[in-house]
Amino acid sequence: MNAEIIAVGTELLLGQIANTNAQFLSEKLASIGINVYYHTVVGDNNKRLQQAIEVAEGRADMLIFTGGLGPTKDDLTKETIASSLAEELVYDEKALASISDYFKRTGREFTENNKKQALVLDGATVFANDHGMAPGMGLNKNGKVYILLPGPPKEMKPMYVSYVEPFLRNFTTGENIYSRVLRFFGIGESQLEVKVQDLIDGQTNPTIAPLANDGEVTLRLTAKHQNVDEAEKLIQHVEDLILERVGEFFYGYDQEFLHDKAIELLKKKGLTLSCAESLTGGLFGNQVTESAGVSSVFKGGVICYHNDVKQHVLHVPEEVLFTDGAVSKECARYLAENVKELLEADIGISFTGVAGPDASEHKEPGTVFVGLAIKDEPTVVFPLNLSGSRQQIRERSAKYGFYHLYKKLEEI
């Protein structure tokens, strides 16, 4: 079965609010085997909503509406659908009583327009609104399923979980959808695709969907099966094939992120970290401290933006700054080693480079050096050649720091 989500509300078209309902519903529907092929947004206009209904009926088995169930004149979803289906609107007694009780409790007048919220399509299954007034409803007619839900996410989401999903399962084959996200760093989307292109071209079940985002690449593997164990086997087989080719760039699954993975390894190995940041200006340290309980492994950092701080606090030799420059392999090495010693940590990591938009020390924007000093091991400096805006270069530099830290920790 395939569905179309139709969000109703002029405020969505004006960009005043984001359509988070569609994202939530798409994910939930996919998990029970209902394919969402279209998202539509239409304003509070009867004629245009009717046109959207007619288009959706021509290409979807299920039409899911969010918004337009309120008490005002521009809340016209129910009325338009009732007219389209030649159905009457009738009062749902439970909803009417619930709304009436609310107004009594709050000492407000229960006006006629508020009674409108208790109107439902005749013959529809009614979904109680435990967090608001207007109920939702579901109607199966003319070979189509119509679902009407309130617009506010705080009302729609719990209604979906408690009442709508159990109702929708009556229309599914029992075949569920299971997904796993593989996360990669240090390889571009096009490079990764080339290495697994034959797997993408031959995909059936599971499917493979690549996505690039802020210097990372993810592959979403999605399998359909009635049995979760069989779906896991399908996904695992394809994952194994992928990691045989690009496993060196793989670092985690689903909602795992680089900084969390690196800190997890620091805790596991009982090592402490310090950082010296020039071009990143504290971005790396900020991300470290986003993780709970990080005080056990993070000693602190030095923002050494000016050369005076590099020289007098972190003891980068004046000769290095004069000859090689602040943006250099040698400077990154001294920063990493000396911040480690200064803060008495097991590991020192450093960032120096040109964020742009202008060149510096005759070096182009995106020229970056990340230094990594771990205990008594030889210090390693990773040269980077990044592209993007000033902010993107800074953020990607910090990510590369976490990536190289994570990979190095895996080795020791």
UniProtKB/Swiss-Prot annotation:
Pfam families for this protein: CinA, CinA_KH, MoCF_biosynth
Alphabetical list of Gene3D superfamilies matching this protein: 3.30.70.2860, CinA-like, MoaB/Mog-like domain
Annotated SUPFAM superfamilies: CinA-like, Molybdenum cofactor biosynthesis proteins
Recorded family membership: Belongs to the CinA family.
Protein name stated in the entry: Putative competence-damage inducible protein
Species the sequence originates in: Bacillus thuringiensis (strain Al Hakam)
